[in-house]
Amino acid sequence: GVSVSQVPKAVKAFQEIAEKYRVTIATYGHASDGNLHTKMVIDPLDKDEWDRGVQAVNEIFDVCIELGGTVTGEHGVGLSKAPNFMKERQSEISSIKAIKAAMDPENILNPGKLEQWTGPFLRDLRYPCPEYMGHSPAVKE
């Protein structure tokens, strides 16, 4: 999310990123409070398209941060946002880990997620992606 005054700049930047990487990106959300959501339409089995999508997502998060916003302003972080959240909040990660350890010493609440995340996040997604499919014939070269 970004501040309301930055929404037009963010949406324009997202459109430019979509064109740059030749991907379809839908932007929607709660513009009145700066919460923007982007959804990309890609074939996760097409390695080239997947790679372009990953680059586009990283640039979208960079734009949000550059405009004074955040990579996650409304919902939980989730696995797909984890790398960019970690980059944005580097100075806070040790505190997050300490709070998690103090509140959940047996690690039964959402184990292996953000506070323990070491990447790459792609291995834990619920849909296939080229990096973790090896040389499957389903991957389009």
Where are these regions (language model features)?
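Conserved glycine-rich FAD pyrophosphate-binding loop
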Residues: 1-141
